[in-house]
Amino acid sequence: APGEHVYGLGDKTGGLDRRGQSFVDWNSDAYGFGASTDPIYKSIPFFIASGEGGGAYGVLLDNTWRSWFDFGHRAADRIEMGAEHGPIDYYVIAGPGVGDVTRRYADLTGHAPLPPRWALGYQQSRYSYMSEEEVRSIAARLRAERIPTDVIWLDIDYQDRNRPFTVNTQTFPHFAAMVHDLDTLGIKAVAIVDLHVADAPGQGYAPYDSGTAGDHFLRRADGSTYVGIVWPGRAVFPEFTDAGARRWWGTLFAPFVHDGVAGFWNDMNEPAIFDDPAKTMPADVRHRIASDDFAPRTATHAEIHNVYGMLNTRATYDGLRALAPDERAFVMTRASYAGGQRYAATWTGDNSATWDHLRLAVAQTLNLGLSGFAYTGTDVGGFAGGPPPDLMTRWFEYSAFLPVFRDHSAKGTPRAEPWLDGPEQLAIRRHYVEARYRLMPFLYGLAEANARTGDPLARPLIYDFPGTDVHDCDTTMSFTLGGRLLIAGAPRPEQRNSYDACLPTGTWYDYWTGAAVTPQPSVSGPFGTLTLTPRLDLLPVFVRAGTILPRAPLVQSTSQRPDGPLELDVYPGPDCRGEIYDDDGHSMGFARGMFLRQQVTCAADASGVARVTLAPREGHFAPWWNAIRLTIHGGVDYTARIGGKAVAERDGGFTFADQPQGAVIELDRR
């Protein structure tokens, strides 16, 4: 239709709206990809179309062969799609809204599991930290600089000759002790484990030996084992379409789980191959399909290619759950397919240190969220090249409000740790990391809601404000967290001239000051505009009126117990509500009722807030807080009572004992 806009397809480049473009699905290693490179790492053949009236529908083309989509590129009024081979098997998902489609798509393809809380913290990485000494030094510097951090990532150079499931004992002589010592600092270790097993007969390399004995490696049409060149040199590849091979793969993680490694990173799983002109396996490589969910048969790589990376993460995830059944598994993947969110978080791959890539990062993250992958991030600052200081700082600011926050850079590029551009840049970056940690109760609540509903954490404006994609306002760098926090950056993040920030119609509050803002009504759409002048130290963030936002005192790690009350910030407005959610952050106990959920509402009229109500608590988890601090924004002074007893006001807020049975806080204007 003329006013239709198209979203989804995972990590495709080209901006948020797919209208007028065409794409190919074929998982591809795309180092340093450009703003219009296609295909890249993932194949998620699902799109959502949204019309002028805010109505929406979705289509999933469940075909794993090389496929294509045309959204008005050849013919302006037509959507076309197809594939080289395979079934014409597609699902049409009704709305009426974008959110309805997204949730039903998650119901169809599977919900992402609730991640460990530490996966929402700040994460430091480099290709590569070359030694145990360097890892310890990075951890010590992060703590000395007071940069809240939850993860340090280990890229391939921790391994012996780039062989998966090994450790270079020359450079990492005390690997298990290092992992333990990081944990005492509140920092988890996440280690890369690629799927290419070194072709090393007779060398005592256990993954090769056990995989060969179990007949777990792919073969060519003539029956010979397929060998490709990747990081270890000659390598063989697991038969992830075989349930037995997946179980075997999962057992290989046991020593690392025993050593305390908290998560694993499946890279290069498009799969990427160095010595093939197509940069992947030949199409005639054979895959044995032997799994409870499919009839047994043999398929060619041309059919399996787009799901191979997802099956790799399935094997990893299932293996970790089997090794530690009461712990949540964390897997990061580069390649995947529709439904891969059941097994892994993802990132947008080997991006570049440019302002255009920062713009692209927001669109890719939002479209991945609409495609099921709620846990998505980008390499902060860009993987390829070196970011100028201002770009790195701005990237930190945006990433503080995106689901996965990882600073990662390539070998041979300038170092990109947050302190490297001097104290002024570091202070800004630290401030935004701290802001994220203060928001952790809110972020973690969004994560829990995603596991239940499929609602993404980071959302385009159309998700919660239908019709906002039909307007003249440039919202390229705008998105929301849970429909409650609106990040409204300049359309070109490097610009220094003023711009009109577009806020959906209604009342909003400045997150940084708590003050209500009054946008100018727009004649072109359901927006008001605020004219803002960019500042390097300020990313504009607004809170939707009617929000009750849970926050926490600052910590240096999510494993640290916050010192002080839970904070509830009330931003008066219609349908005023919020939710408090908590659990232990790492185990499966929440599935057995070991969680806490409490609804919070407020009643307001023209004169202000009359009361805040905490409903009786659900679940059986004792939280870290024993008190609550309530702050009412909007510039009105109040007195407060609970059960007729006055609550003292201090520094603009009211602190009272935790209320697991529920309570009503009565408020009167002074």
Question: Would you name each region that the model predicts?
Answer:
Residues 1-116, 126-127, 132, 139-144, ...:
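Catalytic and substrate-binding clefts that recognize carbohydrates or anionic sugar/phosphate headgroups
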Residues 317-331, 335-347, 360-364, 368-378, ...:
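Catalytic core of carbohydrate-active enzymes
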Residues 148-429, 464-466, 475, 481, ...:
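Aromatic- and carboxylate-enriched substrate-binding clefts and catalytic-loop regions
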Residues 46, 105, 142, 182, ...:
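A residue-level signal for conserved active-site and pocket-lining positions in enzyme catalytic cores
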Residues 11, 48-50, 60-63, 71-72, ...:
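Glycine-rich, histidine-containing beta strand-loop boundary motifs that form or position
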Residues 122-133, 236-245:
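Active-site mouth loops of central-metabolism enzymes
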